Regions:
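Short glycine-rich, Thr/Ser-proximal phosphate-binding strand/loop in the N-terminal lobe
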Residues: 13-50
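A glycine- and small-aliphatic-rich helix-loop capping segment at beta-alpha/alpha-beta transitions
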Residues: 20-24, 92-100, 122-126
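Short glycine-aspartate micro-motif
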Residues: 3-7
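Short, well-ordered amphipathic alpha-helical segments that serve as non-catalytic structural scaffolds
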Residues: 54-66
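Conserved phosphate-binding catalytic cores of ATP/NTP-utilizing and phosphoryl-transfer enzymes
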Residues: 1, 107-127
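Short, glycine/acidic-enriched loop or turn micro-motifs at the edges of active sites
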Residues: 10
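Short beta-strand-loop/turn "lid" adjacent to the catalytic site in phosphate-handling enzymes
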Residues: 64-94
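A glycine-rich helix N-cap at a beta->alpha junction
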Residues: 101-107
Length: 127
């Protein structure tokens, strides 16, 4: 089975494709990035301009095509601090879903920290 994980941040979108083996171990099979510097486009009203929403959707669509081309079975997408910061994050989430069928989960601070901790433990073989 292959899965893709997309991290949607304020400066870049990253996608890593993993192959999950029967023993539930996994191996990276590709990494793709799109630098967008979205954080600098937040208006004084804490909204991402419509033009940047469209560009973000285009970027995620590109990553989705890469995932499909790699034979990915499932895509997981996560919005982090940037999504918590902007007032129109649900508009961005909805537009990404409409265009790609990908559901973006906006992580709260605790969930984001836990995922980072677990990833670090896995990377360094800690239990």
């Amino acid at each position: 089975m292959k899965v893709a994980v997309i991290d949607l941040g304020s400066n870049s979108f990253h996608m890593v494709i993993y192959r999950i083996d029967k023993d539930m171990s996994f191996r990276s099979r590709g990494h793709y990035s799109d630098v967008n510097a979205l954080g600098r486009y937040i208006s004084e009203t804490a909204e991402l301009p419509l033009e940047k929403i469209r560009e973000s959707v285009k970027s995620v669509s590109h990553l989705a095509r890469k995932a499909r081309g790699a034979g990915v079975d499932r895509v997981y997408a996560y919005g982090t601090g940037f999504f918590r910061k902007i007032d129109n994050s649900m508009t961005l989430v909805d537009e990404i879903f409409k265009s790609t069928g990908i559901v973006v989960e906006v992580l709260d601070e605790k969930a984001e920290a836990e995922i980072i901790f677990r990833a670090a433990c896995h990377a360094y073989g800690l239990k």
